[in-house]
UniProtKB/Swiss-Prot annotation:
Residues 35-54 bind DNA. It comes from Sinorhizobium fredii (strain NBRC 101917 / NGR234). GO terms for molecular function: DNA binding. This is Uncharacterized HTH-type transcriptional regulator y4aM. The keyword DNA-binding applies.
Amino acid sequence: MLSVDPEKKRAKANAVDIYVGRRIRQRRRWQNMSQAALGEAIGVTFQQVQKYEKGSNRVGAGRLQQISDALEVHPSYFFEDMPDDTQSIGQGAPNQAYIPPEVIEFAASDEGVELIRAFSRVGNLNVRCRIVKLLKSLGEHDW
């Protein structure tokens, strides 16, 4: 009788799982959807959605398609801009600009999404540049 190696019995999440999870979270938040609402749409609990988003549980192909449908994106969205070197996920790939984890976390927060949405509605390039200068200036002060 063949015995199953306990280490191989349950696949552990890896850097790709973490990256896909982050993309799920970003898209869900961009859509103003709660974890509970996404879970209901795909037939899982909000806790399971949390695990997918953290990368602690792998998302199978069928489930990824359900998530894609619920979030109104093509499944390839979750792999876009993924570093070629999956070991560098979270640290920035050599051919990509490094984005610190705290910036990624802020961008995915309610406040970050609100700021990004508001900024993206500013069409005038000069106004955008002034907003960026203002924010940089405010960020230099120790309030």
